[in-house]
């Protein structure tokens, strides 16, 4: 009990400290001072009167949403004496593996720099700045020669690192478990089984109305949808983040989705947010970074060739180029197992006082990175709002998909959860695929690392991301990956090679997400 109270007071202190540096804090302060002029504020009951004023004027709700938003990304409380690196990742071998992986990425980036004889960063000449500013809204028409640039890494390279991950303190001895024999992921992490997942995703139950399911026997779909829209409008009118998060677990109506996601992520486009975005844009105009070419190359290789997303090419460049300059992203490294890469001012290699984070946001884009942004372009058409939503989605969720950690939503746990679900509930299929050299994870990894973006039809992907936001968890990605294998099990049992298995699972664009999840979670015999 005492420990819980101490944890709570520590969390409160840290959130208060974080909010003190925010724009909301100064707005609340200004409102409090302004309220002193009001006749209903009495000196003898000053504290209570100001609280009441905040409640009536809606500022209390804004403060609640800000606190709720901080709690959503806040790491679990650790021992007060624990060093800061424990907050990033408690397991030493995971931290070491992440550190080694980062060195490989940086080496790859630096060797590209040397091979192509180009600097990591340079100031653009005035003429080039003007040219970029003029074509800012039509960068997709640009055709720079990117043939010499290559992605720093692709998901399959990252998978090999995860496959070789081992806990040096863990000795299985002779009693090898079923999972250790069959799975590619060989680290002992606790993952949920289906009964625990049912409990976690209870709102996805067969007898609960869902958007994304057309054949409910209990209630006619249009009746449920009309009622769900009405409740959604009420949630938006209340401007309550927690209520919006609970509501969206049953899916979001298309017309309300953009506002609901913004409410859950606590994004409200203030003039200062637009100004901040414009400052980032100015940084892009003034300086050319090597990662800009990696971003161009990635968009050209992925989104530009996608039937759904090619129309958003200009938006993707704008958002990702600004993202690479955004130093506010660095704050998420406090609870991310990764650390931002460093570079040194020319001629000062190794001198820490001349070290700078590169790129400025600390995130080196990899092959497929632009697909985290692409689906959001369907919801937000104003660049600064689109940018804010993506940045918040990244620091809450997406960073976990390309860093090595023991977090339940981290990619290692998702891979292990996927393999465990298949091995436990579809053992014949799993064993068959393993025997023919088609380990299921080799096929599903690319889906999970991209959060299924670029694989599902957009309406289905947005329904899936509704649930990621609703449950504040990425575990549903592993469940869906297992559900896809279960759905195609009959065909997969007939294949005799990895290529044939990949062909069976090549096109997911016709799949309906919610029926697959429901059947796998609630109709599987456990």
Swiss-Prot record:
Superkingdom classification of source: Eukaryota
Keyword Nucleotidyltransferase: no
Domain Rab-GAP TBC: 251-472
Membrane-spanning segments: none
Record key words, sorted: GTPase activation
SMART domains in alphabetical order: TBC
GO molecular function, one term: GTPase activator activity
Record PROSITE patterns: TBC_RABGAP
InterPro entries associated with the record: Rab-GAP-TBC_dom (IPR000195), Rab-GAP_TBC_sf (IPR035969), TBC1D19 (IPR042507)
Pfam families referenced in this protein's UniProt entry, alphabetically: RabGAP-TBC
UniProt KW Signal keyword: no
SUPFAM superfamilies: Ypt/Rab-GAP domain of gyp1p
Biological role: May act as a GTPase-activating protein for Rab family protein(s).
PANTHER family with a match to the protein in the record: TBC1 DOMAIN FAMILY MEMBER 19 (PTHR16110:SF1)
Protein name: TBC1 domain family member 19
Organism this protein belongs to: Homo sapiens
Gene giving rise to this polypeptide: TBC1D19
């Amino acid at each position: 009990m005492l420990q819980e109270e101490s944890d709570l007071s520590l969390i409160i202190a840290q959130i208060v400290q974080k909010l003190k540096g925010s724009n909301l804090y100064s707005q609340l302060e200004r409102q409090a001072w302004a309220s002193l002029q009001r006749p209903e504020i009495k000196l003898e009951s000053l504290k209570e009167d100001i609280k009441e004023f905040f409640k009536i004027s809606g500022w209390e709700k804004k403060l609640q949403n800000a606190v709720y938003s901080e709690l959503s990304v806040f790491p679990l409380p650790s021992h007060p004496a624990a060093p800061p690196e424990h907050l990033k990742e408690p397991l030493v071998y995971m931290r070491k593996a992440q550190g080694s992986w980062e060195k490989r990425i940086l080496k790859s980036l630096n060797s590209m720099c040397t091979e192509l004889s180009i600097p990591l960063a340079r100031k653009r000449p005035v003429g080039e700045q003007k040219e970029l500013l003029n074509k800012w809204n039509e960068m997709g028409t640009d055709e720079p020669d990117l043939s010499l640039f290559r992605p720093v890494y692709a998901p399959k390279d990252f998978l090999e690192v995860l496959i070789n991950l081992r806990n040096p303190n863990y000795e299985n001895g002779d009693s090898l478990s079923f999972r250790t024999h069959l799975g590619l992921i060989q680290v002992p992490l606790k993952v949920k089984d289906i009964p625990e997942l049912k409990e976690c995703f209870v709102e996805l139950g067969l007898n609960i109305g869902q958007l994304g399911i057309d054949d409910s026997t209990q209630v006619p779909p249009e009746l449920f949808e009309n009622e769900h829209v009405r409740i959604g409008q009420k949630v938006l009118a209340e401007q309550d983040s927690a209520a919006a998060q609970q509501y969206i677990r049953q899916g979001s109506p298309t017309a309300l989705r953009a506002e609901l996601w913004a409410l859950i992520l606590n994004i409200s486009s203030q003039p200062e947010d637009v100004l901040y975005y414009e400052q980032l844009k100015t940084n892009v105009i003034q300086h050319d970074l090597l990662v800009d070419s990696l971003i161009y190359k990635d968009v050209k290789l992925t989104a530009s060739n996608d039937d759904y997303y090619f129309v958003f090419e200009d938006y993707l460049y704008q958002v990702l180029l600004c993202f690479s300059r955004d130093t506010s992203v660095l704050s998420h490294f406090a609870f991310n197992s990764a650390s931002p890469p460093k570079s040194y001012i020319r001629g000062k290699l190794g001198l820490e006082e001349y070290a700078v984070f590169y790129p400025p946001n600390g995130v080196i884009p990899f092959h497929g990175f632009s697909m985290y942004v692409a689906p959001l372009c369907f919801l937000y058409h104003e660049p600064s709002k689109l940018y804010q939503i993506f940045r918040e989605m990244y620091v809450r969720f997406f960073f976990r998909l390309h860093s090595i950690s023991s977090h339940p939503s981290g990619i290692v746990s998702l891979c292990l959860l996927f393999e465990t679900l298949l091995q436990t509930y579809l053992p014949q299929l799993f064993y068959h695929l393993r025997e023919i050299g088609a380990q299921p994870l080799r096929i599903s990894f690319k889906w999970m690392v991209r959060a299924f973006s670029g694989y599902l039809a957009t309406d289905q992907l947005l329904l899936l991301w509704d649930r990621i936001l609703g449950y504040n968890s990425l575990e549903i990605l592993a469940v869906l990956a297992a559900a896809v294998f279960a759905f195609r099990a009959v065909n997969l049992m007939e294949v005799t090679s990895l290529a044939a298995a990949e062909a069976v699972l090549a096109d997911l664009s016709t799949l309906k997400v919610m029926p697959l999840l429901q059947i796998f979670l609630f109709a599987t015999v456990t």
